[in-house]
């Protein structure tokens, strides 16, 4: 069986820059050219959001992107079809970077567990991040995902106790995903009680209690913040800022141009 792209990438000694993108945002037809632009501009891993009608853990930008994605015809079946085309180079240059799906469990349950894993693997999906899947209840799903060589990523937050950090580190296949602050996705402002120093101490604590790599997301919007997070973590995730920078695009080509221009400012 071919080695998982994420597993292969994480063996390299490099700091990672991950892009979060909501399919078919801001206009229908944007996904393939945007994926190409992100790959060409240096995205190491691309997270694709699974649009959901009630994304309670997301900030307003990602909520709006999800609603527009659904309005533009994206379902989980459609998303896998788009990824398959991207992997084959149909409608864009062949996409070879790892692709991770991030979303809620409901669409996967509706799809059917093994059916989804089969179709996702065939499409070229490398991993899954399901924020509402508790690690304590994930054992059976982890075993099935392992059978498909699918990476599964779990979340760590600033209030996660050390023993739970260690459990999450052990259960995450290749890396874990740290929320930088206690907030909805894309909130750059620190929450009450959070300071730059407290966030740094939190990430140092995560490092002490993990053996695998971890990335940091939520609220990272420019090169300065990326480089700051790289001091403590193995990767930085930029999502809301990317969506904001392409939101005004009226065509797929303009969305791709704006995505590429923005992404190059982060490297």
From Swiss-Prot:
<dbReference type="Pfam" id="PF00290">
    <property type="entry name" value="Trp_syntA"/>
</dbReference>
<dbReference type="InterPro" id="IPR018204">
    <property type="entry name" value="Trp_synthase_alpha_AS"/>
</dbReference>
<dbReference type="GO" id="GO:0004834">
    <property type="term" value="F:tryptophan synthase activity"/>
</dbReference>
<comment type="subunit">
    <text>Tetramer of two alpha and two beta chains.</text>
</comment>
<feature type="active site" description="Proton acceptor">
    <location>
        <position position="58"/>
    </location>
</feature>
<comment type="similarity">
    <text>Belongs to the TrpA family.</text>
</comment>
<keyword id="KW-0456">Lyase</keyword>
<comment type="pathway">
    <text>Amino-acid biosynthesis; L-tryptophan biosynthesis; L-tryptophan from chorismate: step 5/5.</text>
</comment>
<dbReference type="GO" id="GO:0005829">
    <property type="term" value="C:cytosol"/>
</dbReference>
<dbReference type="InterPro" id="IPR011060">
    <property type="entry name" value="RibuloseP-bd_barrel"/>
</dbReference>
<protein>
    <recommendedName>
        <fullName>Tryptophan synthase alpha chain</fullName>
        <ecNumber>4.2.1.20</ecNumber>
    </recommendedName>
</protein>
<dbReference type="InterPro" id="IPR002028">
    <property type="entry name" value="Trp_synthase_suA"/>
</dbReference>
<comment type="function">
    <text>The alpha subunit is responsible for the aldol cleavage of indoleglycerol phosphate to indole and glyceraldehyde 3-phosphate.</text>
</comment>
<feature type="active site" description="Proton acceptor">
    <location>
        <position position="47"/>
    </location>
</feature>
<keyword id="KW-0057">Aromatic amino acid biosynthesis</keyword>
<keyword id="KW-0028">Amino-acid biosynthesis</keyword>
<keyword id="KW-0822">Tryptophan biosynthesis</keyword>
<dbReference type="InterPro" id="IPR013785">
    <property type="entry name" value="Aldolase_TIM"/>
</dbReference>
